[in-house]
């Protein structure tokens, strides 16, 4: 036969444990949701600022090229003066160390004296063909030059007043662009790379060996899945292969900036909090179990005493003493038993007298 204390503990303790576990679980998922939302906002803000910085960097270089182009078009220099202008830009900026160069429709390439730029067939080059399609200088798609370097070029038609069709151009190394891309990352532990959505090629990446490779040809599942989203034109923030991933279009270009951070890093702190919460929950359950046991013990002790008295009375012993101190239901019960014992004693005494 189970005692009241055992029954109460058997009912209350499991409910207490369930409540503590549920509260711990709810707290964990709320914390995880808050951290996830915060991280998404931080990654979105980071990639937006990063895109703006890259756009500003590209525009700054493009503006420099445009100034040089307009200077040549307005001054219409002779060959010697043109060389002097090109020499002034060669080595002037680390972003385009070879400065500017010009090719005409006859295949003549004009470069600065100290420039290392080489092109055996300028009129067949990417930069020349793209330059023929526009007056204002714009960036080409990425390509590999004769030196085997991955570059992009800013090119456009040069109107220097001569009867010969000319294109002016300048090269930016993709390795240099990679440095710029990764230097603007604001979120700790996040990484970024630049993609050309036309062919899925990587324009900038922390790992230089990845530059000019295609996302679809990568052995990395994450890069392949990113390539699939880029190909679909889906640039919404999402989780891809365990990475929170954000996309941003670079204004003035066709490029897509991809920034990502492993979710394991994001949830590292919340997982620690979960472990701490479980530990606190277990300690709380133990403390509550002890407190509940003590409360039940002191609450039902008068009932146990009354049970003992009633048992003695059923055995014919009316000499028992009932001590009642409380004013609750148990106290009223005790006083009733006390009155009954007193009445029975009187009846027994009258019988014997």
Protein language model regions, located:
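Amphipathic coiled-coil signaling helices used for dimeric signal transmission
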Residues: 325-353
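Extreme N-terminal signal-anchor transmembrane helix of membrane signaling/transducer proteins, especially
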Residues: 2-33, 37
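Cytoplasm-proximal transmembrane signaling helix
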Residues: 12, 16, 256-258, 263-314, ...
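Extracytoplasmic/periplasmic sensory segments of membrane signal-transduction proteins
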Residues: 41-48, 53-138
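Extracytoplasmic/periplasmic ligand-binding sensor regions of membrane-associated signaling proteins
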Residues: 91-96, 105, 110-184, 188, ...
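Extracellular/periplasmic juxtamembrane segments that couple receptor/chemosensory ectodomains to their
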Residues: 198, 208-209, 217-275
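Solvent-exposed, extracytoplasmic
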Residues: 78-94, 167-210
């Amino acid at each position: 036969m189970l005692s009241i204390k055992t029954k109460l503990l058997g009912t209350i303790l499991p409910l207490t444990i369930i409540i503590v576990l549920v509260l711990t679980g709810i707290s964990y998922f709320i914390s995880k949701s808050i951290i996830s939302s915060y991280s998404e906002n931080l990654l979105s803000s980071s990639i937006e600022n990063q895109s703006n910085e890259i756009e500003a960097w590209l525009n700054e270089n493009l503006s420099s090229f445009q100034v040089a182009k307009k200077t040549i078009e307005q001054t219409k220099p002779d060959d010697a003066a043109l060389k002097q202008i090109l020499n002034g830009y060669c080595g002037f900026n680390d972003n385009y160390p070879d400065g500017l160069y010009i090719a005409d429709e006859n295949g003549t390439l004009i470069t600065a004296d100290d420039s290392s730029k080489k092109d055996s067939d300028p009129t067949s080059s990417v930069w020349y063909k793209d330059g023929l399609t526009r007056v204002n200088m714009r960036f080409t798609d990425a390509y590999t030059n004769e030196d085997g370097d991955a570059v992009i070029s800013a090119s456009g038609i040069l109107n220097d007043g001569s009867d010969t069709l000319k294109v002016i151009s300048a090269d930016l190394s993709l390795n240099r662009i990679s440095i710029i891309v990764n230097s603007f990352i604001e979120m700790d532990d996040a990484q970024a790379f630049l993609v050309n959505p036309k062919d899925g090629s990587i324009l900038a990446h922390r790992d230089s060996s990845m530059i000019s490779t295609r996302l679809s040809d990568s052995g990395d599942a994450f890069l392949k899945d990113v390539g699939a989203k880029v190909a679909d034109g889906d640039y919404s923030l999402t989780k891809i292969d365990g990475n929170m991933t954000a996309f941003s279009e670079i204004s003035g270009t066709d490029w897509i900036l991809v920034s990502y951070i492993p979710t394991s890093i994001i949830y590292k702190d919340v997982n620690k909090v979960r472990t701490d919460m479980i530990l606190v929950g277990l300690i709380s359950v133990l403390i509550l179990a002890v407190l509940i046991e003590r409360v039940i013990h002191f609450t039902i002790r008068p009932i146990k005493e009354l049970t003992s008295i009633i048992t003695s009375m059923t055995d014919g012993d009316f000499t028992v003493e009932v001590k009642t101190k409380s004013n609750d239901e148990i106290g009223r019960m005790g006083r009733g038993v006390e009155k009954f014992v007193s009445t029975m004693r009187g009846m027994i005494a009258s019988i014997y007298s």
